């Protein structure tokens, strides 16, 4: 069970308690800090859409510390990021693996960051296949389709050729922060909020 801290703020009407994620949302900060599942994706998407409705021009910050997760859930977040009219600054803290790495790369170019000791990893999609021979063939074809689709997205986000993405993704392909710059996953390694283009990361 995950413990969610609460913070207390002084307001004109007295003290008000809120969970830490709601407090961060006030500063247009969204946190992806676990496996990317459908429930998590729905929460993140709702937060992103809420922030867009509040101010369609102001940057949104997405902090990622995730081992990856479900492809459809990750793609739903990815499509929402691309749907937004504002810039999305992405930050890797800890790790951004699999779908986490794809979401990291989906940020606005020039505003994709990683902290110095963070790690990134890309690989091909995987999944257990059960059922009749016809079912197995259909599921295998779907995995191959998703493999090409994800490679095309990463190619667009990183500037790497699709063929290289597919080759590198055959096995777990790990990168440190500096390597991720060369690969095109991120634009800059930062050790302080002052190093980013977003001067109000935390208000």
Swiss-Prot record:
Signal peptide stretch: none
UniProt keyword Protease, yes or no: yes
GO molecular function: ATP-dependent peptidase activity; ATPase binding; serine-type endopeptidase activity
GO BP of this protein: protein quality control for misfolded or incompletely synthesized proteins
InterPro entries: ClpP, ClpP/crotonase-like_dom_sf, ClpP/TepA, ClpP_His_AS, ClpP_Ser_AS
Domain of life of the source: Bacteria
Assembly and oligomerization: Fourteen ClpP subunits assemble into 2 heptameric rings which stack back to back to give a disk-like structure with a central cavity, resembling the structure of eukaryotic proteasomes.
HAMAP family on file: ClpP
Protein's UniProt name: ATP-dependent Clp protease proteolytic subunit 1
Species: Chlamydia felis (strain Fe/C-56) (Chlamydophila felis)
Lineage of producing organism: Bacteria, Pseudomonadati, Chlamydiota, Chlamydiia, Chlamydiales
């Amino acid at each position: 069970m995950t413990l969610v801290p609460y913070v207390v703020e002084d307001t004109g009407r007295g003290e008000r308690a809120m969970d830490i994620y709601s407090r961060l949302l006030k500063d247009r900060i969204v946190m992806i800090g676990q496996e990317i599942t459908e429930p998590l994706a729905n929460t993140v998407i709702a937060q992103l859409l809420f922030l867009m409705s509040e101010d369609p021009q102001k940057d949104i910050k997405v902090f990622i510390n995730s081992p990856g997760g479900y492809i459809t859930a990750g793609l739903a977040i990815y499509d929402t990021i691309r749907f937004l009219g504002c810039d999305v600054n992405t930050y890797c803290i800890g790790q951004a693996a699999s779908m986490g790495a794809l979401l990291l790369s989906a940020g606005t170019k020039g505003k994709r960051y990683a902290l110095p000791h963070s790690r990134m990893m890309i690989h091909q999609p995987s999944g257990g296949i059960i059922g009749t021979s016809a079912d197995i063939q259909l599921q295998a074809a779907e995995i191959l389709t998703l493999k090409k689709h994800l490679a095309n997205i990463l190619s667009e986000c990183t500037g790497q050729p699709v063929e290289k993405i597919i080759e590198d993704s055959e096995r777990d392909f790990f990168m440190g922060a500096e390597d991720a710059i060369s690969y095109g996953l991120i634009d800059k390694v930062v050790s302080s909020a002052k190093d980013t283009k977003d001067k109000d990361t935390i208000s």
